[in-house]
Amino acid sequence: MLMGVVSMLGDIVYESGRGIAPDYLYFLGTSAFLVGLTSGIGELVGYGMRLVSGPLADRSHMYWLFIFLGYGLIIAIPMMGLTNSIWLVMILVIAERLGKALRSPSRDAVVSVVSKGMGSGKAFGLHEFIDQIGAVVGPAFLGLMMIWTANNFSLSLQSLFPFYLLMMGVLYLTYRRIKGTVEEIRRQTTATNEKLSRGFWMYSGAVLMNTVGLMPIALILYNGAKILESGGQLWLVPFLYVIVQLVDAPMALVSGYIYDKIGIKFLGVPFALSILPIVFSSLVGLPGVILACIAYGLVLGMQESIYRAAVTDIVPLGRRGSAYGFFNLMLGAGTFVSGVVFGYMLDVLVSPTLMLDFVIVAQVIAIVLLLGARPKKEKE
């Protein structure tokens, strides 16, 4: 619960940034390809660097150091309000994702230990649900600031500094509260050189292909900005992101409970739903963008809860930090390819039919790989 509150406060800041960054970059004159590239590189760094931070956390047992460094880098989001340079904004977007890479494996390992006996699906689902409260409040607050400041991106982004300071304060209090519990359990668990199972690699490959075929939210919002600009309604873009988070939050909680009953085969549902964002994005006008946001929110809610929960069920605790690192590298690589490919296809006006064919092929491969994954519950 405490880590969920910290994540909630973090989400108020960084999800606000993720909701407005495509809008801001479009306002500064950036192409769809560069927005997709920035999103892709950010996710590749954000997920790929976990391959380093995860094993380092396992071997050094310095979980809290990585957590503090990672949350500290969220300061990149309000700092975006201090510049109107396209390239500097792109760098700050990527820097925030680096922070995500540093904190996430250690945070997930801490959550998996503290929630022992609760059920991995429920634990990660509950954490994500609390998390998403901030993910809704943040973009909504930023949207209201955009209205109040008459679409002033700089002042709106700088208004996030107080939330950042509050988050760091609560993180310190959380550390003081649960450090002893985590350390006591950690001393009973040592890192191991046991190889990760074939089922884990099949599962990671399935997630890779799933993300390759999922249209990035940054480009869905970019399309929204293009539609809304003519009416001077760029302030609406953060509220489109609020729609994503409003769907994401309950879906994370519900899917966590279903996953605990059905198991990994339930992941076939978000894989199939991943086709919908591109279908709806091909529709003309704002309604298509709204439907694409809803569809993306359904997938995201499951991606951020049960995708991680499946790793917990496949991998023993001593290798879990490393496993999250490898798993997230696959997730990041898939998101990078997705951002570049979809951004390019939007810029050169590839036909919606061809884009849909690409998505369907990717999701079929993902489902086939998923069928080869056989999670094995570990007794801890």
Segments from the language model and where they lie:
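Helix-loop boundary and gating motifs at the non-cytosolic
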Residues: 1-43, 200-230, 237-240
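Helix-to-loop junctions at the C-terminal end of transmembrane segments
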Residues: 49-61, 146, 251-263, 346-347
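Structural signature of the two symmetry-related core transmembrane helices
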Residues: 65-79, 161, 265-280
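Cytoplasmic helix-loop-helix junction between adjacent transmembrane helices
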Residues: 92-133
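Symmetry-related core transmembrane helices of the 12-TM Major Facilitator Superfamily/SLC fold
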Residues: 155-172, 355-372
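Juxtamembrane intracellular "pre-TM" segments in multi-pass secondary transporters
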Residues: 177-206
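C-terminal transmembrane helical hairpin of 12-TM major facilitator-type secondary transporters
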Residues: 263-307
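A late C-terminal transmembrane helix in Major Facilitator Superfamily
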Residues: 319-348
